[in-house]
Regions:
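Short, Lys/Arg-rich, polar N-terminal cytosolic tail immediately upstream
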Residues: 1-6
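Glycine/proline-centered hinge or cleavage motifs at structural transition points of membrane proteins
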Residues: 181-183, 195
């Protein structure tokens, strides 16, 4: 009986494994191969990545933007998820719909929308000047500020989903019980709700960080060529300079960083707790 179940399980899993191998493993292996053989066999591309100031600067910019985006997105996502989790169920679906609506727009459309809003004559600068908060338009485009705004706007929904899933799995009787025992609202939150929502924070952090590493369109449009991230340079190396060796080496390093991040999270937080599973 157990052998038949084992055979059935493999029969169901095998097609997925084959598709994964063909569509993911083979291309990744080819990228890894190219990073060692283009333009000449050896570790020359990786040595150049370490020694060339340009590539170190691009890597530093990518990490800096990814970390900043992750921190702000998780903070905002936590606030949004907290409000949704403590809203009556009949209204919760509408708030969740509002969070999911940005997924219906492409990243290109959203980036162009921010270009319109953040330009010197845009709505945001006009509002700041009319309110008397600034005397002249702020430079919100072609710098890291504009790129950060666009990236955070794109990433907040990704942070909300795992956080909300975890919060909805927390027993709603715990905080009122703590309040009944004399704990204040802040103490109840810090001692009970926040620790129980930690798996969601970890899941949201790693999800947003990994996705932020691969941004291409948003920094290209909002950065105006002055904020270059790894994904942009990979695209530039493949389509413009035809420097496949450096491009594939950068892609390999980016993939390695993602794998290491996932491995650390898997070691710190059990998989069944990452998304609020009971």
């Amino acid at each position: 009986m157990s052998d038949s179940r084992f055979s059935t399980s493999w029969a169901l899993v095998l097609p997925a494994l084959l598709v994964t191998a063909i569509c993911f493993a083979v291309p990744v292996a080819n990228v890894l191969r190219l990073s060692f053989v283009e333009p000449a066999a050896g570790f020359g591309n990786y040595v150049e990545l370490v020694t060339e100031p340009l590539y170190r600067s691009i890597a530093a910019t990518t990490l800096r933007m990814a970390v900043a985006t992750t921190a702000i997105s998780v903070l905002l996502g936590y606030l949004v998820a907290y409000v949704i989790a403590h809203t009556a169920p009949r209204h919760r679906q509408w708030l969740l719909l509002a969070v999911l609506m940005p997924f219906w727009l492409s990243v290109l459309v959203r980036a162009f929308a921010w270009v319109v809003l953040l330009q010197r004559e845009g709505l945001i600068n006009a509002a700041l000047i009319s309110l008397g908060l600034v005397d002249q338009p702020l430079a919100l485009l072609r710098n890291e500020t504009g790129v950060l705004i666009g990236m955070v706007h794109y990433m907040v929904p990704y942070a909300v989903l795992p956080l909300l899933s975890t919060m909805l799995g927390i027993d709603p009787r715990l905080v009122p019980a703590a309040r009944a025992c004399g704990a204040g609202p802040v103490r109840s939150f810090l001692k009970i709700f926040l620790p129980l929502s930690l798996p969601g924070i970890v899941a949201a952090t790693i999800l947003v960080f990994i996705l932020s590493l691969g941004f291409l369109v948003t920094p290209a449009l909002l950065g105006g060529g002055k904020v270059v991230m790894v994904a942009q340079y990979i695209e530039f190396g493949i389509s413009e300079t035809l420097n496949w060796g450096i491009a594939t080496a950068l892609a390999t390093c980016l993939l390695a960083l993602v794998v290491v991040s996932l491995a650390l999270v898997a070691r710190l937080v059990p998989a069944d707790k990452l998304f609020g599973a009971k």
